[in-house]
Amino acid sequence: MSGRLIGIARRDRTRAAMEVVDRGEISPGEGVRGDFRGALKPGRNKREVTVLAREDWDAAVELVGRPELEWWNRRANLLVEGMALPRTQGATIRLAGGAVLEVTGQTDPCFRMDEIVDGLQAALTPEWRGGVTTRVLAGGPIAVGDQVECGE
């Protein structure tokens, strides 16, 4: 199954504003270059890069009556569209520039989502709607518009 990368975001510290960029770099042990979370727990980080599907985000914000809410409020690193994200640990997500991500689990929505909109945490909870956490197996450049493929 393939789709397209339509958003890249990063933040340099916890609770910092998300910086949305058109291109970037993904590397093992660092995640999305410039994002603080990817570099936590070197060699043991199961959350180097987080990926969110546009269709899942749209369903969640529709449920809370805020369809205009921007995706980066979810605090994910990558936004893809046109594909269902794998829901199996060990599945891979491959980006056109050569980066390969291994799914380590679902991104559990936290209480901070309700700080944005009441009910958003619950709207993101079912069916892995909050996205997936990944570990970087291979790095590479990324850019909005890149093709993305999933494998089990």
Predicted segments, located by residue:
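Metal-cofactor-dependent catalytic cores
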Residues: 1-152
